[in-house]
Amino acid sequence: MSQLEKIYGVHAVEALLRHHPKRVKHIWLAEGRNDPRVQTLVALASENRVTIGQAERREMDAWVEGVHQGVVADVSPSQVWGEAMLDELLDRSEGPPLLLVLDGVTDPHNLGACLRTADAAGALAVIVPKDKSATLTPAVRKVACGAAEVIPLVAVTNLARTLEKLQQRGLWVVGTAGEAEVELYQQDLTGPTIIIMGAEGKGMRRLTREHCDYLVRLPMAGSVSSLNVSVATGVCLFEALRQRSAKRKP
């Protein structure tokens, strides 16, 4: 059997029980915790025949790096999707697909926040390069608040090649750049779209930028010149959602 990993936090563990219960092998609860959220977890665990035990908080503190909220689960390792799965995802898409690409985002908290935002905005998947990128870890899952168990994270060997293949399938690539002439709100995002966010400070890599069909910038009205990448991602994805929702209305 593959070595188990520990996932922690109420939202992350609850999402696993709801979407991938077979991966959950055992749940640990902090001694004395019996609030409504924990009772929900206990009920879900019982439905899926997952065993539950108790542990001291200081013992749980030693298991994980982060705020575990008194909930830790032993789970089978997850698999990050590969490039070959993109075609399957696109074939299953019921409307114009919306994909998010994170080019060089290495901070686990930013990745977790972007996964959460991407799921909330209806993105089909999040794509990252295999090198120079954060990947799924317990910390990422905790920040994602369950979204990491729902939205596929696709790691690709050659991002430029992946973008070319997606363009051949009819998707438009929209990259974000502070010096772009067109503002985000002027760009049509209602069709099959890929939104690319670069690393903070560095932006997109040169080859990634060269594969963009459009470049857009976020208008800034204050004294700061940029936003945290997870915040900027939320602005872009929810503008796409706003445009798509408006287009669907009669």
Swiss-Prot record:
The keyword Transferase applies. NCBIfam families: rRNA_methyl_3 (TIGR00186). Its EC number is 2.1.1.185. It is found in: Cytoplasm. Coiled coil: none annotated. GO terms for molecular function: RNA binding; rRNA (guanosine-2'-O-)-methyltransferase activity. The lineage of its organism: Bacteria, Pseudomonadati, Pseudomonadota, Gammaproteobacteria, Pseudomonadales. InterPro entries: 23S_rRNA_MeTrfase_RlmB, Alpha/beta_knot_MTases, Ribosomal_eL30-like_sf, rRNA_MeTrfase_TrmH, SpoU_MeTrfase, SpoU_subst-bd, tRNA_m1G_MTases_N. It is an enzyme of class 2 (transferase). One of its GO terms (cellular component) is cytosol. Belongs to the class IV-like SAM-binding methyltransferase superfamily. RNA methyltransferase TrmH family. RlmB subfamily. It catalyses: guanosine(2251) in 23S rRNA + S-adenosyl-L-methionine = 2'-O-methylguanosine(2251) in 23S rRNA + S-adenosyl-L-homocysteine + H(+). Keywords: Cytoplasm, Methyltransferase, rRNA processing, S-adenosyl-L-methionine, Transferase. Specifically methylates the ribose of guanosine 2251 in 23S rRNA. The keyword Nucleus does not apply. S-adenosyl-L-methionine binds at residues 198, 218, 227. Its main location: cytoplasm. This is 23S rRNA (guanosine-2'-O-)-methyltransferase RlmB.
